[in-house]
């Protein structure tokens, strides 16, 4: 009896122990399943074509969608380097793919992890992927140095993805265009590369770049407009996300081109990379940071420069440096934010002439400067600013005073006299060369062209020609003369304006009168916005034309077309009424 009772007690203990073990295994399995299959992760943040920031944010490896938080491990090719990378806290592994024995009698066609000129390695791509996918959650960037490696590698990636093993973003990189200082062609064939990706592994982020070479005797050589436009021509129609690798030592001098490139698609980003021998300025990195949204640019930069850059970039008291030809994002408008939040302001001027002083409102926004000319062209004319009070301030004094004011501003020069156009642009160019223009600058006028030709206004062709020749780094802001708007914005008026502005690489903001929108061709605003990814519309209203109620419907209709790309140049009271209406709706 005692033995039976003892046996029963032992059996009970074993039963409880077995239940405990099974429960522990079940709990572990559930936790693992939840970790690997968090809601939305499998189809979104953890897919090979997912946004890298969304993926790392879902894992808690970055704290916000800021590409500066992403860290990189270079050339994780050999088994030793790969192991070191896997044991690090780096978030993305970058490795080079070549073909074993490339160009020799021993060429096998097997993708290996090696940077040219190396053609042998202790690590094949398959071994590398097995290790990285099986033991880490790090993002992956594969750099292809030869077109022969691309097809077999993408076949392998597709098989592993179909087996459910690739559950993270994959970046596919190759230099497909000749870039700065390259005298010979070493790039991967662009047509073949893009075709292979499209055929074999389209669900990945593309990383197409330019071959480059830094020459210390030509430090200012950089990417040309033609190089950047050719790249957009190649990949503008692909459905994938695209991140363009750009040599960081060359980016500042080519910023007008890369600013244009980023504006062409929300799918685009840049990845700035640094060669070990490149001289690099932290000011250049800060300039890029200031002129982009935080999710648009990754920084693959060496220490200690990277830490220095991060410290300065995240310093809220640092005075930023904005590109004069850039958009109002992120200076005055956050990505995806409402254009109604950007306010147009007119400075208060006391006195006149050289002793005049300017007072700015407490709020931030676009500073509207109605610009004329003092003197004639033959008398060394001076651009001046006309104010509602009748005071006159030289444009140079106005801009220099603005340079000393803290806060976020944009400048909107409205050319009131045709003769003031080129002298005003020349002044902008000179101040920019002296480092005294740190804000986006718009240059606009009511222009004469085609069906809206009216004497006394700036000729449309002259506006564009003067900008191109004297100071191209601006936003062009053309409007129609009031004399031709009796029937609103008719079809021919829109057609002629769009034909004039066709092919502009600068941003353009079409200036429209709110009172006339209700009498205009249906879809006028939508048609103007569709002309370019960089196009915006600014709706203005003169209170002498009537009260807010008379334009309320037109203003709300304009905002309904695109709340992010329509701006409002309104009296403060009207703007408050519109904000209240938007809030109620």
Curated annotation (Swiss-Prot):
The chain crosses the membrane at residues 14-34. Pfam families: Menorin (PF10223). It is a single-pass membrane protein. Keywords: Membrane, Transmembrane, Transmembrane helix. It comes from the Eukaryota. GO terms for cellular component: extracellular space; membrane. It is found in: Membrane. PANTHER family: MENORIN (DENDRITIC BRANCHING PROTEIN), PROTEIN FAM151A. Belongs to the menorin family. This is Protein FAM151A. It comes from Pongo abelii. The gene is FAM151A.
């Amino acid at each position: 009896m005692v033995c039976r009772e003892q046996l029963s007690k032992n059996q009970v203990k074993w039963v409880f122990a077995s239940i405990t073990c099974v429960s522990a295994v079940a709990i572990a399995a559930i936790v693992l399943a939840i970790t690997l299959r968090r809601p939305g992760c499998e189809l979104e943040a953890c897919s090979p074509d997912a946004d890298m920031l969304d993926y790392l944010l879902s894992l808690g490896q970055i704290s916000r969608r800021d590409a500066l938080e992403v860290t990189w491990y270079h050339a994780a090719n050999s088994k030793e380097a790969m192991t070191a990378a896997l044991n690090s806290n780096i978030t993305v592994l970058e490795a080079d793919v070549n073909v074993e024995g490339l160009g020799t009698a021993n060429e096998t066609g097997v993708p290996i992890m090696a940077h040219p000129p190396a053609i042998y390695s202790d690590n094949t791509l398959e071994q590398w992927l097995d290790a990285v996918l099986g033991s880490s959650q790090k993002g992956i960037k594969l750099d292809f140095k030869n077109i022969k490696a691309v097809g077999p590698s993408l076949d392998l990636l597709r098989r592993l993805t179909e087996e459910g093993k690739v559950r993270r973003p994959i970046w596919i990189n190759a230099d497909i265009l000749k870039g700065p200082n390259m005298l010979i062609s070493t790039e991967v064939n662009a047509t073949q590369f893009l075709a292979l990706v499209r055929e074999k592994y389209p669900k990945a982020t593309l990383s197409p770049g330019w071959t480059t070479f830094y020459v210390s005797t030509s430090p200012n050589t950089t990417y040309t407009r033609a190089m950047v436009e050719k790249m957009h021509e190649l990949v503008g129609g692909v459905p994938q996300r695209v991140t363009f690798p750009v040599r960081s030592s060359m980016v500042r001098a080519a910023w007008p081109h890369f600013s244009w490139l980023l504006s062409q698609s929300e799918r685009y980003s840049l990845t700035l990379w640094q060669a070990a021998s490149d001289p690099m300025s932290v000011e250049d990195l800060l300039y890029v940071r200031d002129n982009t949204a935080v999710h648009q640019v990754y920084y693959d930069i060496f220490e200690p420069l990277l830490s220095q850059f991060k410290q300065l970039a995240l310093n809220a008291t640092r005075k930023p440096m904005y590109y004069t030809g850039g958009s109002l994002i992120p200076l005055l408008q956050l990505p995806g934010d409402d254009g109604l939040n950007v306010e147009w302001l007119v400075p208060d001027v006391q006195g006149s002439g050289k002793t005049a002083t300017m007072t700015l409102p407490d709020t931030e926004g676009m500073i509207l400067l109605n610009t004329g000319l003092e003197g004639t062209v033959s008398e060394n004319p001076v651009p001046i600013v006309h104010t509602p009070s009748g005071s006159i301030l030289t444009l140079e004094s106005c801009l220099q005073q603005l340079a000393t004011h803290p806060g976020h501003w944009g400048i909107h020069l409205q050319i009131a006299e045709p003769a003031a156009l080129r002298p005003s642009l020349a002044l902008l160019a000179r101040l920019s060369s002296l480092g005294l223009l740190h804000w986006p600058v718009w240059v606009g006028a009511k222009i004469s062209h085609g069906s809206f030709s009216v004497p006394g206004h700036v000729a449309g062709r002259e506006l564009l020609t003067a900008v191109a020749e004297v100071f191209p780094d601006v936003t062009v802001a053309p409007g129609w003369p009031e004399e031709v708007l009796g029937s609103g914005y008719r079809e021919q008026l829109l057609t002629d304006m769009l034909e004039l502005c066709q092919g502009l690489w600068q941003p353009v903001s079409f200036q429209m009168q709110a009172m006339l929108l209700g009498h205009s061709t249906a879809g006028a605003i939508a048609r103007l916005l569709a002309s370019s990814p960089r196009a915006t519309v600014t709706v203005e209203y003169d209170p002498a034309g009537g009260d807010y109620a008379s334009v309320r419907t037109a203003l709300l209709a304009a905002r309904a077309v695109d709340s992010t790309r329509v701006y409002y140049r309104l009296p403060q009271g009207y703007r408050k009424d519109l904000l209240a209406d938007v809030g109620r709706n």
